Amino acid sequence: MGKYYCDYCDVFLVSESPSVRKAHNSGRNHLTNVRDYYSSLGHDKAQSYIDEITRMFETGGGNSTSNRGPGGNPPGSQPGPPNAGMSGPMRPPFSNSTAGPNMPPLPPAMLALMNGQNGMSSPGSGPPPMRFAGPPIPNNMPPGMMQPPHVNGYSSGPLPPQPQPASGGQGAPPLTARMNPDRARQLG
C-alpha cells in the first residue's frame, strides 16, 4: 500500500513518487472532489483556509496545529507528531557551519577538500571525493570554474587570432572572423 493518502478522494495512491501524485492531483475525479469539498464548506470557511495557506507561504512555511481536514489530520483521526510533513525538506544527515540558513550543508568530502585535507577518510565515512583529470588551472581556480574576463574581454592566455586582410588589399568583413570559411567565400 502506498504512503500517500488523498483526503479529498479517500484513497491511498499506489506509489509515493511525485509524478504519480501530480497525475492524481490533475485528474478529473480529484479536481471534482476538491471542488465539492470547498463548496460544501461555504465561502467564509474556504476563504479562511486560503488565507491561512497564503500566510504560511508568505512567512516561509510553518505548521498550523488546527485540525482542518484535507491537508491536515483527517477529521476524527488522532493527531500525528508535531510538524509532521509540514517542516519543509528533510536535512541530510551531515551538517556544518559553512552553510547559510537557506543553503544545504556541504557533504563531508567537500568540507575536507575546502579545509585543505586530501579527502581520504576512514572506512564507512562515505565515497571518496571526485577527482578531475586535466591540466592544472592557472590562478588556483577549482576545476569547472570559469576564469573572470580581463579588461580586454578575454580570459587569460594568448589573444585570439586577428583576421588578416586579403592579398588584394581589401579587408574582410568583420563577421568573417566568426563565420565558417566556406560560408564567407559564398558571400563573396
Curated annotation (Swiss-Prot):
Intracellular or extracellular location(s): Nucleus
SMART domains per the UniProt record, alphabetical: ZnF_U1
One family name in Pfam for this protein: zf-U1
Annotated GO MF terms: mRNA binding; pre-mRNA 5'-splice site binding; U1 snRNA binding; zinc ion binding
Disulfide bonds: none
UniProt function note: Component of the spliceosomal U1 snRNP, which is essential for recognition of the pre-mRNA 5' splice-site and the subsequent assembly of the spliceosome. U1-C is directly involved in initial 5' splice-site recognition for both constitutive and regulated alternative splicing. The interaction with the 5' splice-site seems to precede base-pairing between the pre-mRNA and the U1 snRNA. Stimulates commitment or early (E) complex formation by stabilizing the base pairing of the 5' end of the U1 snRNA and the 5' splice-site region.
Protein name per its UniProtKB record: U1 small nuclear ribonucleoprotein C-2
Native source organism of the sequence: Puccinia graminis f. sp. tritici (strain CRL 75-36-700-3 / race SCCL)
